């Protein structure tokens, strides 16, 4: 009800140009009147709105992503599953290194074995491998994004086989080498649907779908 009222009051900010939207971000911050490390007992709830275009400068063109094999974003038992500011702070150093090398974002591996694909810094990730849509399972260190959920529901309703499971970086590499990785994309409230055209792992570059947007990715975006 608060959100509906807010948007109706600020509807002049809703953009109409193609590829634009009104970004809505609710958040909370603690405001207890003391210092120290403790659970928050009082918080302020805020909603901000902003007209936006594409999250990445590439727009709907495929982005380049670097797989991080040293730093970790989150571990099971922590806050990786939550929309928590600290999760983003933990990803900043690796993100800056990726940007220096010309990559838009970091694709994180699990925090224990550095073996399993988890998520990109600002979005969940999906792959089409030999006709099957594969996305990392929610194991407690991955954000259960609403856009991820929506993509899964849409794809299943249209007859696609969608698997939420562990996906190792080795399996992904084999699919790339064998030509079975047909396309890849990220999805999130800010990025919406963003095609991935290149992955870099340990300084080896892999091009996906010739660096072009895939059919499923385009369909979801449209």
Question: Where are the regions a protein language model picked out?
Answer:
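Extended, Lys/Arg-enriched charged tracts that mediate electrostatic binding to polyanionic substrates
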Residues: 15-29
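FAD-binding glycine-rich core of flavoenzymes that anchor FAD
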Residues: 2-19
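Helix-start/capping segments and mature chain N-termini
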Residues: 1-5, 27, 34-222
């Amino acid at each position: 009800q608060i959100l509906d009222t807010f948007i109706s009051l600020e509807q002049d900010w809703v953009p109409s140009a193609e590829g634009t939207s009104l970004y809505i971000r609710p958040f909370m911050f603690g405001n207890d009147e003391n210092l120290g490390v403790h659970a928050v007992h009082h918080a302020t709830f805020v909603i901000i709105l902003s007209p936006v275009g594409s999250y990445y400068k590439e727009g709907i063109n495929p982005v380049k992503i670097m797989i991080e094999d040293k730093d970790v974003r989150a571990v099971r038992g922590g806050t990786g599953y939550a929309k928590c500011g600290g999760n983003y702070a933990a990803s900043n150093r690796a993100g800056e290194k990726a940007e220096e090398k010309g990559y838009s974002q970091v694709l994180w591996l699990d925090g224990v074995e550095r073996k399993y694909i988890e998520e990109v810094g600002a979005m969940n990730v999906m792959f089409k491998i030999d006709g099957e849509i594969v996305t990392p399972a929610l194991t407690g260190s991955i954000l259960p994004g609403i856009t991820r959920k929506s993509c899964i529901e849409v794809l299943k309703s249209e007859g696609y086989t969608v698997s939420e499971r562990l996906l190792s970086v080795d399996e992904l590499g084999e699919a790339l080498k064998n030509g079975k990785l047909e396309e890849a994309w990220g999805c999130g409230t800010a990025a919406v649907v963003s095609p991935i055209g290149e992955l870099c792992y340990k300084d080896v570059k892999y091009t996906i779908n010739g660096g072009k947007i895939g059919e499923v990715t385009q369909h979801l975006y449209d």
